[in-house]
A protein has these predicted regions:
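Acidic, glycine-rich two-metal-ion catalytic cores of nucleic acid-processing enzymes
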Residues: 181-376, 460-462
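Helical catalytic core of nucleic-acid polymerases
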Residues: 90, 99-101, 128-157, 314-429, ...
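A short, conserved structural fragment
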Residues: 166-182, 455
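Short amphipathic alpha-helical interaction segments
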Residues: 153-170
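Catalytic palm active-site di-aspartate
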Residues: 345-346, 385, 455-467
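Conserved catalytic core of nucleic-acid polymerases
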Residues: 2-6, 14-16, 32-106, 112-124, ...
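Polymerase palm active-site segment centered on the conserved acidic dipeptide of motif C
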Residues: 469-491
Length: 491
């Protein structure tokens, strides 16, 4: 295969939020015999459908040359710190043999399950959700079955793994289940035991053939979901042109932001731990520490880029990848073909989407306008708008924005609240509809940009592009959004 276009370029894509990996580096065509035996982990939950192998040989003319998916080590997964050692040294043989007749396979299956909980280390540090703050995470039984056995059907393997981890070792329980299940609403939740909760992350290289095959099956599922989505196809094509900052560059930028007392989009003061523990800072919850941001960056990129993941209906189909999950101040250091990237985004997109969906009277609302009319400082308006419409009715009435909307957009507010009260999805229906509208808009924008040869990094309601493409990108964004009935402008 022709690899001349790769010469002289150092490109690596990395491990991600949920250890999702992409394989890359060779051009794939229907006639290639490329070895695809290494794995991709999809959202820490491994999916498999044997028919997915056909996807590799069909319909890839426009994306095959861009499955640029480089690994440093193709068999790495991310697991909670200390779990590898404790499973090997202290888990009793009888519990392992209940899982699989091969002890080494049983241990790796336990690690595979635990890899689903790895990202709680990061989520616990940066969430206001009480459930996530305590380390809990919902995992669907059907997907766990597929991850751990290659089949969606119920099996004793999953149950025996959970039982073994809950029983634990002489060092304590390794993971626990909350035992709360509601059909059609939420699955069982799991979290790490006290000895492993918030203790960090480590890399583990899978060694057994059986577990490698499970990982391999996830590879085909990941690709099949990626190539069917316009945003994902765009991302696959752009990854090969991306240059990540070095750790030294990230650290230097972080120190600059600390010195200048900059804040994140959520209003947190960018700070440095400076070798202190977080407990040293009385207002730690109001700070974003550069050391933790660098940990996330390395987690997302130290072994390749994440396979873009299409969210479910509850997320409106939003796409997650290494860049949507990356701290924004680090993402701003990324380059495309050696060129600095800048962001193009819509002005007050979600308030204007709410106007469109729920019968609002105003058009082209801005944060500045709301700040002026409400007397709330503009930074607080921006931060509160990140979550205002998605809250429960009770929490919306606690917001400092509710008075503005009650006074200026009462019909819109009543329509929105009525839907929350009557929908089977309750208050979550609002975010579902608004995210769906956002995704529809961004999908059309990206498709139109790709037609003229422009590829971008997707960040939910914003796009990152080179400075030379900015004018065309904002023009396309403005053309598309008007056709969707949302009155705002891109800048």
């Amino acid at each position: 295969m022709n690899k001349s276009n790769l010469k002289g370029r150092i490109i690596y894509t990395g491990s991600t939020e949920l250890n999702t990996y992409v394989y890359s580096g060779e051009l794939l065509t229907s006639s290639d015999k490329t070895n695809l035996s290494h794995p991709i982990q999809l959202n820490n939950l491994y999916h498999y459908d044997s028919s997915n192998q056909l996807v590799i040989t069909e319909g890839l003319e426009d994306v095959s040359a861009h499955f640029a998916l480089f690994f440093k080590n193709q068999d790495l997964i991310k697991v909670p710190a200390k779990t590898v050692a404790v499973l090997n040294k202290y888990m009793t043989k009888d519990k392992l043999y209940d899982i699989h007749p091969d002890k080494d396979v049983a241990i790796e299956l336990c690690l595979l399950f635990l890899s689903n909980l790895t990202d709680t280390f990061f989520k616990m540090r940066d969430t206001q959700d009480v459930y996530e703050k305590a380390g809990w995470k919902r995992l669907k039984a059907q997907i766990l079955n597929e991850q751990l056995t290659g089949s969606k059907f119920e099996s004793d393997t999953r149950k025996n793994i959970i039982a073994a981890l809950a029983a634990g070792t002489s060092k304590g329980i390794i993971a626990e289940c909350d035992g709360i299940y509601s059909k059609g609403h939420h699955s069982f939740s799991y979290r790490l035991g006290p000895a492993y909760l918030s203790k960090g992350v480590e890399s583990y290289e899978v060694k057994t053939k059986y577990v490698k095959q499970l990982l391999n099956k996830a590879y085909f599922k990941a690709i099949s979901e990626t190539i069917d989505n316009p945003i994902c196809k765009n991302l696959i094509k752009v990854y090969g042109s991306i240059e990540l900052p070095t750790k030294e560059e990230v650290l230097a930028e972080g120190r600059r932001l600390v010195k200048e007392k900059k804040k994140t989009k959520k209003g947190k003061l960018i700070s440095s731990l400076n070798k202190h523990k977080k407990e040293y800072f009385k207002d730690a919850d109001k700070r974003s520490f550069i050391e933790e941001s660098i940990e996330i960056f390395e987690y997302l990129t130290d072994n390749g880029f994440m396979v873009p993941r299409v969210g479910n209906a509850k997320s409106g189909g939003r796409i997650s990848d290494s860049f949507t999950l990356m701290p924004s101040w680090i993402r701003n250091l990324v380059k495309m073909d050696g060129k600095k990237m800048i962001e193009a985004d819509y002005s007050a997109l979600h308030p204007n989407i709410a106007m469109s969906l729920y019968g609002g009277s105003k058009e082209f609302i801005t944060h500045a306008e709301i700040s002026k009319e409400s007397g709330i400082d503009i930074d607080s308006v921006k931060i509160e708008h990140l979550s205002f419409f998605n809250k429960t009715e009770k929490d919306m009435y606690k917001s400092n924005l509710v008075n503005y909307y009650s006074k200026n957009e009462l019909t819109m507010l009543r329509n929105l609240l009525e839907e929350k009260r009557t929908s089977e999805f309750e208050h979550k229906i609002t975010s579902m509809r608004m995210f769906k509208k956002e995704v529809d808009i961004m999908t059309e924008v990206i498709k139109d940009l790709n037609k003229v040869g422009i590829y971008v990094i997707y960040v939910y309601d914003a796009l990152m592009c080179t400075e030379s493409d900015k004018e065309e990108v904002t023009k396309m964004m403005n053309n598309v959004i008007i056709n969707h009935g949302v009155k705002t402008i891109a800048k």
